[in-house]
């Protein structure tokens, strides 16, 4: 019986290692179940052993009991993760010089110009999963773009007040199976298949401006008189919230406030804020703070338009890799956008202008792990350095980070 328990110990070690590498929820549940089974089995084996070795048990019962029950808990404690991580404070110094970095030069750029028969209006929300790009434009139309096949498919879901109709879709996200479209008026999430057919409607009972699909739920940024992070379960029930900023952004920024870092964790930053938080699966913790040497904006700057003309620099977008933090920020003039690159290994940052990469400017808005994306309409192509783009084309740019 006892040697069977050591086999279970070995299996538990494997599960612990998987949990440590991936923060896998299934591995956590399996670990807890297995730990319970091992403890019950050890008690049963002790009772059986006590019957056959009554003299030895009377002499060493305390030691054996502690040893047999302590082994699984020792494995657990030795492999447990420390959820408290030290926040990285990045000092950003204003500069008009060009950033020189081998890491930036190693970013790979892919560009696809795809013809569309249905003109796409300015983009309100987008997401990219593999070779599928999903776009919601300001006319409330939803498009699926198959990057490999260069095919554009428009959703046939009509707007209306019927139960299966969207009234006011304001943002979307996707995973490997579905597209999730949030209706702000109905406060519910429409779950669509990859061919844009309705599968399910999830009621949330709360309002948010943008969201991302993550493990076991949704990471959301809610805005009213303040900005709050919300975590919703897959069934739409909010189970966690945290205030990120007391400032209401009446002007939105180009950068997506919620990114998926290269480590697989979701990160969130309020609009016009310089602090990036990390969602570790249980709570939101401070991860990165950009310091422009001016302190936090005062309470008088309650709106984005006021902050933009206040002479205070602020962070616009951010991208997190294993070795670097790349961010863009608005200079004190309220117009000029520069970049800052922070090297995690040596703790050095440099800021300034960013040279084109393969003749394409870096202006990504969305990060998915190792890749960042931008979806560009023809009239915006020149901002990215793209030329000869047909007016009936929609352009998808993928930036692949080296590490």
Predicted regions span which residues?
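Short coil/turn segments at the loop-to-beta-strand junctions that recur within blades
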Residues: 118-120, 157-164, 203-209, 244-250, ...
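C-terminal motif of bacterial Sec signal peptides marking the signal peptidase cleavage site
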Residues: 75-77
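Blade-loop segments of beta-propeller domains
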Residues: 151-176
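Conserved blade-ending motifs and adjacent loop-strand segments that build the rim/top face
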Residues: 289-308, 345-369
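Repeated scaffold domains used in trafficking and secretory/extracellular systems
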Residues: 122-125, 166-171, 206-213, 250-258, ...
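Beta-strand-rich domains and repeat architectures in extracellular enzymes and scaffolds
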Residues: 111-139
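A short helix->beta-strand "capping" segment at the edge of beta-propeller domains
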Residues: 94-120
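Short beta-strand elements that form the blades of beta-propeller/WD-repeat-like
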Residues: 132-137, 177-183, 216-223, 261-270, ...
């Amino acid at each position: 019986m006892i040697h069977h328990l050591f086999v279970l110990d070995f299996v538990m070690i494997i599960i612990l290692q998987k949990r440590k590498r991936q923060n896998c929820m299934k591995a956590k549940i399996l670990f807890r179940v297995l730990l319970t089974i091992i403890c019950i089995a050890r008690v049963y084996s002790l009772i059986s052993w006590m019957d056959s070795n009554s003299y030895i048990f009377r002499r060493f019962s305390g030691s054996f009991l502690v040893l047999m029950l302590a082994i699984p808990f020792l494995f657990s404690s030795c492999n447990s993760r420390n959820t408290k991580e030290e926040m990285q404070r990045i000092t950003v110094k204003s500069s008009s010089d060009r950033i020189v970095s081998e890491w930036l030069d190693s970013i790979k750029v892919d560009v696809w110009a795809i013809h569309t028969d249905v003109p796409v209006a300015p983009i309100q929300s987008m997401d990219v999963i593999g070779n599928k790009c999903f776009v919601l434009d300001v006319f409330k139309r939803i498009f699926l773009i198959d990057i490999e096949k260069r095919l554009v498919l428009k959703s046939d879901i009509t707007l209306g007040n019927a139960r299966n109709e969207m009234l006011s879709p304001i943002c979307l996200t996707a995973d490997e199976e579905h597209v999730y479209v949030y209706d702000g008026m109905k406060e519910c999430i429409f779950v669509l298949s990859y061919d844009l057919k309705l599968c399910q409607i999830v009621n949330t009972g709360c309002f948010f401006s943008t969201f991302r699909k993550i493990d076991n739920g949704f990471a959301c940024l809610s805005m009213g008189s303040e900005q709050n992070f919300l975590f919703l379960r897959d069934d739409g029930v909010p189970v966690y919230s945290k205030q990120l900023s007391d400032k209401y952004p009446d002007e939105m920024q180009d950068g997506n406030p919620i990114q998926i870092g290269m480590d697989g964790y979701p990160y969130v930053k309020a609009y016009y804020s310089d602090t990036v938080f990390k969602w570790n699966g249980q709570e939101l913790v401070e991860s990165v703070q950009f310091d422009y040497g001016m302190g936090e904006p005062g309470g008088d700057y309650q709106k984005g338009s006021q902050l933009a003309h206040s002479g205070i620099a602020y962070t616009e977008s951010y991208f997190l890799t294993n070795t670097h933090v790349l961010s863009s920020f608005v200079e004190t003039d309220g117009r000029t956008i520069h970049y800052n690159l922070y090297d995690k290994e040596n703790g050095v940052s440099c800021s300034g202008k960013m040279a084109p990469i393969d003749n394409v400017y870096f202006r990504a808005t969305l990060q998915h792990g190792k890749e960042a994306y931008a979806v560009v309409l023809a009239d915006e192509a020149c901002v990215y350095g793209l030329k000869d783009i047909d007016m009936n084309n929609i352009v998808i740019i993928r930036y692949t980070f080296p590490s």
